């Protein structure tokens, strides 16, 4: 019998903590983004880390579950402490952002059209490739905003970013 999965996420009143791992998949200067179909903003693919799970392995698991392919989880690029409000909840999110390689067979479209969809729990997710430029990412409401101009930065030591929206703490 397998133990139930325990995501590192908890709610206390109107506040929620999440431990998230996400991937920066680049192809032809485009980045893969995703969202729930009902949502207005886009973000990097990934998900919550489970208790006892390394963040890089969590990203690999999420990629297989959502994209149906084995991803090559690379170097840790960013560690972000992100404080924001979303749908009336104050979030404190600890995010680990890794370089992510995807196999060539994973669909690529440079026209901004949806290239992949999947069901994750009760959410219908959609994925697309967009130019990895700050202006384009701002136009689609990419979150976290502090990463918009940094996705094409050359690899180096991981960068620690703290972002606090006005009134989110």
Which residues are covered by each model-predicted region?
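Active-site-adjacent beta-strand/loop module that shapes the phosphate/pyrophosphate-binding cleft
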Residues: 84-113, 150-151
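A short coil-to-beta-strand element that immediately follows conserved catalytic motifs
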Residues: 70-79
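Nudix hydrolase/Nudix homology domain
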Residues: 40-42, 107-109, 113-169
């Amino acid at each position: 019998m397998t133990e139930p999965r325990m995501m590192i996420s908890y709610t206390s009143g109107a506040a929620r903590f999440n431990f998230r791992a996400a991937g920066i998949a680049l192809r032809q200067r485009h980045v893969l983004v995703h969202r729930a179909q009902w949502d207005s903003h886009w973000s990097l693919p990934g998900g919550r880390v489970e208790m006892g799970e390394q963040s890089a392995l969590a990203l690999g698991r999420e990629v297989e579950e959502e994209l149906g392919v084995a991803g090559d989880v690379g170097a840790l690029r960013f560690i972000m402490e992100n404080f924001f409000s979303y749908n009336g909840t104050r979030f404190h999110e600890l995010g680990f952002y890794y370089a992510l390689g995807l196999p060539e067979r994973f669909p690529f479209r440079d026209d901004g059209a949806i290239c992949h969809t999947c069901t994750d729990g009760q959410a219908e997710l959609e994925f697309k490739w967009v130019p990895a430029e700050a202006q384009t990412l701002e136009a689609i409401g990419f979150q976290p905003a502090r990463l918009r101009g940094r996705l094409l930065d050359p690899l180096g030591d991981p960068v620690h970013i703290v972002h606090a929206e006005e009134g989110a703490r």
